């Protein structure tokens, strides 16, 4: 009745599969409607009580982070999503870092924003043409901005103790191949003179939240499980003195190497999942 990708097992419980698929669709609608309410009703109120633009950014991002936390808690108690964050305190208190992560699913941005309340995020410009426009266009940076302006905005945020969140793949990981890692995160780290914190997003296969997955679809054998693992920091000072393009390439290669290595180790040792992310 329901088809699943060839690399996944068959559905083991049709009732739970339908329940989770419908729950996922309801969650997406909730996010879409909630984003519009926040963007067009809540943000103007926050702006009224903000002394300056940076003050508004800080308050608005923290508000969004708290909303996403409550949203993820709702998904947990309804049995749709489970999360594990071994170093949550360290991640949530991080300052002045370029945070990079692999990108297996639609919820990665929501999860990372919930976990890192003081994070700016560089997002694809075409997202501003979606219902997320209410949030994205007001408090985050889109990747179609002039490079000089983008780098300056990121450096200013980092100098103020905020973080910059980037998914180096630029888009969600496809099911049967890998994306090329872009050098933008590394270039920002070199420009700002800050360190890079890679995060490996592990867990089960996120079928239903991947690129081009059908709307009515879900992992056939288990709820969505997310595992957020902090990897060793990459020090930009280790690449000081190198030309910027060379330093950016070396750092990008290191990011990819760390994430792929973490994925291989995770698949060997994880006992919580019956299926795994593609990375």
Put a short name on every predicted segment:
Residues 9-84:
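A transmembrane-helix-recognition feature enriched in membrane-embedded lipid enzymes
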Residues 82-83, 164, 196:
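Hydrophobic beta-strand scaffold residues
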Residues 130-134, 176-243, 276:
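A cross-family acyltransferase "interaction/gating" segment
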